[in-house]
């Protein structure tokens, strides 16, 4: 997985994208074939996959959280399934936000575990079995759309309206993960985030393919006004510029902005530089939830940075507030239909009463 997309991916295709076109073609053929022909394990509960068309952040994690909250409101017990990218653990693990650190399980799983049961696993079939064994009656996959080894009942693809598909080329010449046609065929619906127009082309393609789409926006949680405040903003996420725009939308003046790689753990020198610069310039330090959990649980300067930082938390808010509940209902119906087909075909699902792995 690429942790930081090259800037040229998000501009009009230039000589680099065209030079890499043969590799993009080969990558696309392999990725498309895997999506179309992968053997997928049967799961006895509904599976919702929150993915995206491209490498990088589009808002998958806050979308997954919003769906989980809607599931809990319906009396369900949702469980998140994550690969645990950025963490060192290579065994299927139930994430404990009070015990684990991001360096072990990854930053996104720690955030998800604050909302609902969360399992990390490099082997998604094994992770799904663990969630079922732990009592989950709805599985929400955070990413994994292009490489899923599970039967998916509802695939929601999130697309950022300011970035869209970037230059439109497939990795490594651009940010697209697999041929768009194959991705659309495998998708159930799209979620367009924000009010930009960069995603309009893919939305029109989805409409022609009879795929519904929802709209949503990222909203700052709580009263996080920063009017007139001079800040040092730092972010190690896929799209730091989006975070900086959010900070400025709260009325802050960003005097210093520091960007790091997605999922990157800061070095002692980088932490010291942030603290020293903020103290020297008299700046408030602001950061993202992901960066905050990566720093949490450490000692020394990292602990001091945690103490000094204000976290800007965001929620994914659907324009139609009933949409998350509708997505869950559709997934439940699709799961029932899938299980009937599987039973007729003699396909066995992951045991509903499996022993913990």
From Swiss-Prot:
EC number(s) reported in the record: 2.7.1.130
GO molecular function per UniProt: ATP binding; tetraacyldisaccharide 4'-kinase activity
One Pfam family cited in the UniProt record for this chain: LpxK
Matches recorded under InterPro entries: LpxK, P-loop_NTPase
Any one cellular-component term (Gene Ontology): plasma membrane
GO biological process, any: lipid A biosynthetic process
UniProt keyword terms in alphabetical order: ATP-binding, Kinase, Lipid A biosynthesis, Lipid biosynthesis, Lipid metabolism, Nucleotide-binding, Transferase
4Fe-4S listed as a keyword: no
Residues bound to ATP: 54-61
PANTHER family xref list: TETRAACYLDISACCHARIDE 4'-KINASE, TETRAACYLDISACCHARIDE 4'-KINASE, MITOCHONDRIAL-RELATED
Function: Transfers the gamma-phosphate of ATP to the 4'-position of a tetraacyldisaccharide 1-phosphate intermediate (termed DS-1-P) to form tetraacyldisaccharide 1,4'-bis-phosphate (lipid IVA).
Annotated protein name in UniProt: Tetraacyldisaccharide 4'-kinase
UniProt organism field: Rhizobium johnstonii (strain DSM 114642 / LMG 32736 / 3841) (Rhizobium leguminosarum bv. viciae)
High-level lineage: Bacteria, Pseudomonadati, Pseudomonadota, Alphaproteobacteria, Hyphomicrobiales
């Amino acid at each position: 997985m690429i942790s930081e997309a090259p800037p040229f991916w998000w501009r009009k295709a230039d000589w680099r994208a065209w030079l890499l076109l043969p590799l993009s073609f080969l990558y696309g053929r392999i990725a498309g074939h895997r999506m179309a022909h992968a053997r997928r394990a049967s799961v006895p509960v509904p599976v919702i996959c929150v993915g995206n068309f491209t490498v990088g952040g589009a808002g998958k994690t806050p979308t997954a959280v919003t769906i989980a909250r809607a599931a809990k409101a319906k009396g369900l017990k949702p469980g998140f399934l994550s690969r645990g990218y950025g963490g060192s653990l290579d065994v299927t693990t139930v994430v404990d936000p009070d015990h684990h650190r991001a360096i072990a399980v990854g930053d996104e799983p720690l955030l998800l575990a604050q909302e609902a049961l969360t399992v990390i696993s490099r082997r998604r079939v094994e992770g799904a079995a663990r969630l079922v064994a732990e009592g989950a009656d709805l599985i929400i996959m955070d990413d994994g759309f292009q490489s899923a080894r599970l039967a998916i009942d509802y695939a929601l693809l999130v697309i950022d309206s300011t970035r869209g598909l970037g230059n439109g080329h497939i990795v490594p010449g651009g940010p697209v993960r697999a041929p768009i046609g194959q991705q659309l065929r495998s998708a159930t619906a799209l979620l367009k985030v924000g009010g930009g127009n960069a995603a309009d082309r893919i939305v029109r393609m989805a409409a022609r393919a009879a795929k519904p789409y929802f709209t949503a926006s990222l909203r700052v949680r709580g009263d996080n006004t920063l009017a007139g405040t001079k800040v040092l903003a730092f972010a190690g996420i896929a799209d730091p510029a989006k975070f900086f725009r959010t900070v400025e939308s709260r009325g802050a003046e960003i005097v210093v902005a520091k960007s790091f790689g997605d999922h990157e753990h800061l070095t002692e020198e980088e932490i010291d530089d942030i603290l020293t610069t903020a103290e020297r310039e008299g700046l408030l330090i602001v950061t993202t939830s992901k960066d905050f959990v990566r720093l949490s649980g450490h000692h020394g300067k990292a602990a001091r940075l945690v103490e000094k930082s204000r976290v800007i938390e965001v929620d994914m808010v659907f324009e139609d507030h009933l949409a998350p509940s509708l997505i869950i209902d559709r997934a439940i119906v699709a799961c029932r239909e899938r299980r009937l087909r599987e039973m007729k075909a003699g396909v066995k699902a992951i045991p509903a009463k499996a022993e913990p792995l």
